[in-house]
Amino acid sequence: MFQGAMVAIVTPFKAGQVDEETFRNLIEFQIANGTHGIVPCGTTGESATLSFNEHERVIEIAVEQVDKRVPVIAGTGSNNTEEAIRLTKHAKNAGADGALLISPYYNKPTQEGLYRHYEKIAKAVDIPLVPYNIPGRTAVNMEPDTIARLAKIDNIVAIKEAAGSMKQITDIIARCGDELVVLSGEDFLTFPLLCVGGKGVISVVSNIAPADMANLCNLFLGGDFDAARKLYYRLLPLCHGLFYETNPAPVKAALAMMNKIPSDELRLPLAPMSPANRLRLRQDLQAYGLI
């Protein structure tokens, strides 16, 4: 169920509120272009600045609009284990197919603390779980040995790995084998990860180029490695351009330039892109043929 290119979808806002109509339209754009899954309320979805009610509503909208056409993996992570359990229970009750849980941030747990955090959530909620390792945002790297321990838990089925290290990725796959699906959390590592046994990506770039990101995974998983490699190198400027500034400012700017969202409205403390980087991004989109 969890393989291919799954979009870490943005949460559009209008006058400070979740723009439900635009969000539904974005989901339809994704499914029409072959995206393999929808991942709402992640980093790209600005989960950190959604209220609990908004967070739950965005998941409900996603499940309703997708209507079982592709899997929905709902972001339900928190640095408070009990809050993560509450959000994950809601995702299950709403009909999500799985839950994506960022590692606890700010409180800097030990490896044992990380293990117990995910273990408790797994025991509390019977839904497929995808831990999310992104030490650049959490300040703690979940080490391969810890991930291998978590892979023994029945409903921990995959990991979104975004430590930026191919060594770590290969260590995880070597330790876990078929017990755990490894997904890239970084678009620019999608092809290298597939080459060492990973199964896909939870993608920011899929917001703006869903068909090509899905095709990259389809080609590779179908055995056409050379075509996949060529497409990867074509996508690479977008993989870099969407991170000229803190995600999701660039991807929202790109979607606005493409007329997929009415504006690139963000919630503080995130700010719009600088004019210089906005120009660079526009040039990338023009070169790719997206605008």
From Swiss-Prot:
UniProt-recorded name of the protein? 4-hydroxy-tetrahydrodipicolinate synthase
The cellular component terms of Gene Ontology attached to this UniProt record, alphabetical and capped at eight, are: cytosol
- Please give the InterPro entries that the UniProt record associates with this protein: Aldolase_TIM (IPR013785), DapA (IPR005263), DapA-like (IPR002220), Schiff_base-form_aldolases_AS (IPR020625), Schiff_base-form_aldolases_CS (IPR020624)
Record's Pfam families? DHDPS
* UniProtKB keywords: Amino-acid biosynthesis, Cytoplasm, Diaminopimelate biosynthesis, Lyase, Lysine biosynthesis, Schiff base
What would be an example GO MF term here?
4-hydroxy-tetrahydrodipicolinate synthase activity
Q: Which GO terms describe its biological process?
A: diaminopimelate biosynthetic process; lysine biosynthetic process via diaminopimelate
What is its subcellular localisation? Cytoplasm
This protein's assembly is summarised as: Homotetramer; dimer of dimers.
Q: Which HAMAP family match?
A: DapA (MF_00418)
Q: Which CDD domains match?
A: DHDPS
* Entry binding sites for pyruvate: 44, 202
Name the active site residues.
Answer: 132, 160
